[in-house]
Amino acid sequence: MTEDVFEYSAAKMRKHGMTDMAIAQFRRLYEVWRNEEASSWIREDEVEPLVSVPSFHDVYETINHDKAVDAFAKTAFLKLNGGLGTSMGLDCAKSLLPVRRHKARQMRFIDIIIGQVLTARTRLGVDLPLTLMNSFRTSKDIMKVLQTNKKFHQEDIPMEIIQHQEPKISAETGMPVSFPANPELEWCPPGHGDLFSTIWESGLLDALEAQGFKYLFISNSDNLGARPSRTLAQHFENTGAPFMIEVAKRTPADRKGGHIVRDKVTGRLMLREMSQVHPDDKDDAQNIDKHPYFNTNSIWVRIDALKAKLASYDGVLPLPVIRNKKTVDPTDPTSEPVIQLETAMGAAVSLFDGATCVCVDRMRFLPVKTTDDLFIMRSDRFHLTDQYEMEDGNYIFPDVHLDARYYKNIHDFDARFPYGVPSLAAAKSVDIDGDWTFGRDVMLFSDARLEDQGEPSYVPNGEYVGPQGVEPDDWV
């Protein structure tokens, strides 16, 4: 029965020009979902906490920095760049979103990524190829940026690979959903775990090996902290491991996220998402002292090891299936309920004997998922250096909550900060409730709070905002 129903999805994918690899990958996701295998728990008594993870600072103090350039010269760089930023109201690649100014130029994510690559090439005298995993929706605009950048050149290594698409599935029937009002919404990406089959199908690994590259560093395009590092390249080479995940220490804000554990039977590392945690194990899983490390989604892989692993599975790795319950039109909760089937890139760690982790500081984990994150990134907490590093004093940021009614959409957000976001240098937390527009040179301090006035409101130029709202001058 499952096979018969799946054939409707396969036929739809063929009609739209999807490859056999894309169909094979989706077939596996679909069959796992229909057989309920995806709901298997990773029980607390089956795993051990991850302990004794070397830190970036320890690694930096112990490696041979001259030798590190040699390891770095054998490293290629891949950025996951398929996201549209729909959570912020964008209809284009999120990496085209302006982040901050540098020498009077407005810099987007993609500009900073290119700057990081060009700086590394120049300073260290290495090739450092950059490949972007784009989607059908992001490819055209992003490739135009790369091809019109007069300083960025690359031969023999492709600048992009295109991630697959799959049909959204009706939650009721298991059939591919139909949405004539906007047929594009009938499709979704298979999650960043799709990277592996896309790499296999594209021939990227062969191209890299032919040019003498041995290592591949992969990270998200919205994480500007995950820049190329000769220190980590040398450490990865020293370990001899086939696969390395950059992890970071969990904070209370991270307690509901996925974390890294070790399988008691196999000894292999595992990425355990909260959807894989049994209800009886939830307290243990959310205990950040017991399970102190989370996955930053930045990984290092040995090209030969990844190539061999993919060959053994015909290009489709058996990763745990994530089932996302949504509506076909994500902006309309009354539209048809659908299932989107995905896999996570970091889950591949469990397939490799000898995989390892390295603990990095928050300076290498600066994701921008919402306008709350962008608010901090655009503030005076950060300085974009000439090496295109997002630099902050301690990388301990204020807890920011902006009223989603007025700030979630990037166009609404920009309209309310016409002179840029306020100063956060003295802010411990920020809570803005209601429709507030900010003048020039506004400073937020302590636990800054603005309450909803029931109408559009304005913070004048040069004002201070603290726990009592806009503070009278004699209070400051």
Residues covered by each model-derived region:
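Conserved short loop/turn motifs at secondary-structure junctions
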Residues: 129-138, 221-223, 362-366
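Left-handed beta-helix
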Residues: 1-76, 234-476
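Conserved core of the sugar-phosphate nucleotidyltransferase
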Residues: 127, 141-313
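Hydrophobic/aromatic beta-strand patches that form the interior of the parallel beta-sheet core
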Residues: 78, 97, 131, 160-162, ...
